[in-house]
Design a protein with these regions (language model features):
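Calycin-type beta-barrel ligand-binding domains and close structural analogs
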Residues: 1-203
């Protein structure tokens, strides 16, 4: 249930400030202005932190996902990106590097292609170093958080938790990943049933 790991999603870049109350009012998630600077900020390394969903199959996927990173690279054409995903699904590390993202600037939409499957996403405006992912499936909603590093600040976490409450989730419904479950570097020993993978070095 993270960017590029679920079939239908809406990407939200960063966190939109909200305040948690007994009856929270959600701060509006505003689509990003898809200028060159915004598109360029999508490039690089991201770490999936946590997520929650009302859609049972997505909840099952999140429970299997122990840790994940993804890196977005320039593609062959303008407004086309290549994506490499490295994730631990239960005890197995998996690398996927065949998906692409197409950017449609006129409506802040991203289309993610993986094989024969495609999903549309709307990029939302906020902090350049964070992703909130808002996704929809059969009238179900979900949110997930990614960041440039495995750690987020207390303030950033509180803002995301407020958004969870705004969308009807209890905090205990959020499923959190842990850096201790990161896939090992090449050559390290792994447990039975696991596959060691190395993350690409960032230049």
């Amino acid at each position: 249930m993270l960017a590029f790991l679920i079939p239908v999603l809406s990407l939200t870049m960063g966190l939109v400030r909200a305040h948690a109350t007994d009856s929270p009012t959600c701060a509006p998630l505003v689509p990003a202005e898809m200028d060159n600077a915004t598109v360029h900020r999508l490039l690089g390394h991201w770490v999936y932190i946590m997520g929650a969903s009302q859609y049972p199959p997505h909840v099952a996927e999140m429970k299997e996902l122990k840790y994940a990173t993804y890196t977005i690279f320039p593609g062959r054409h303008e407004d086309e990106f290549n994506v490499t995903e490295i994730m631990r699904l239960n005890e197995t590390c998996v690398v996927r590097n065949t998906s692409k993202i197409h950017v449609f600037r006129h409506n802040s939409t991203l289309v993610h292609e993986e094989g024969q499957e495609a999903s549309m996403a709307e990029l939302m405006h906020s902090d350049k170093d964070l992703f909130i992912l808002k996704h929809f499936k059969d009238n179900h909603v979900g949110l997930s958080l990614s960041a440039r590093t495995p750690k987020v600040t207390k303030e950033q976490l509180e803002e995301f938790e407020a958004q969870l409450r705004c969308h009807g989730f209890k905090l205990e419904e959020a499923i959190i990943t842990s850096p201790k479950d990161a896939c090992p570097a090449a050559g390290e020993e792994v447990g039975e049933g696991s596959t060691a993978t190395a993350e690409p070095q960032q230049g």
